Regions:
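Catalytic-domain carbohydrate-binding cleft regions of carbohydrate-active enzymes
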Residues: 1-175
Length: 175
């Protein structure tokens, strides 16, 4: 993904980085080769795409668009879908006789064909646990039938024993 200065640099957790452009054959092939070499070849059978919401907000940011430049403002949902499909396809090519399991945080329309998603980085609280259950049911009604959450929360203090037990029990019932 580029802007007028070259690759679009965005703030990630530990520094600046750039997103791959999955509308470009070379970027997609690079991703799949890395997935094969660094994950599948060492025996890990699950693909997990994280931090793939493509939060690129520069007005001049564009992607390759399969040969016709496309403003990123119109491709925010497309990129995570294509990333997830590339992950799914590489897993399927690696073990064609086995069922593919992929999880992805970016949750665009069409995702259910390739992966499950989860609610993202949630907080350790009773409120969040209740909210996540509502979110899972709503996502399921919207066609994302396989969803999940960070049990016990991702951010905040460690859950006490009761909260962790209740959260685990609740997530056993998530669609």
């Amino acid at each position: 993904v580029r802007d007028h200065n070259g690759p679009c640099l965005e703030q990630f957790w530990d520094g600046w980085g750039a997103h791959l452009d999955f509308t470009r054959d070379g970027d997609r092939a690079w991703w799949q080769a890395g997935l094969q070499r660094q994950v599948l070849d060492i025996g890990i059978d699950v693909g997990w795409n994280d931090n793939n919401e493509y939060e690129i907000w520069g007005e001049r940011a564009t992607c390759h668009g399969f040969g016709q430049a496309l403003p990123m403002a119109r491709a925010h949902a497309l990129q995570p879908l294509l990333m997830t499909r590339a992950t799914f396809d590489q897993q399927a090519n690696n073990k064609p006789d086995e069922r593919v399991y992929t999880i992805t945080r970016g949750g665009p329309p069409g995702l259910q064909r390739y992966a499950q998603t989860w609610s993202g980085d949630n907080s350790t609280s009773w409120h969040t646990m209740r909210w996540n259950q509502r979110m899972a049911l709503t996502m399921s009604l919207s066609g994302l039938f396989n969803t999940g959450h960070d049990i016990g929360g991702f951010d905040g203090p460690a859950p006490d024993a009761e909260m962790l037990i209740r959260w685990t029990q609740a997530c056993c019932l998530v669609p």
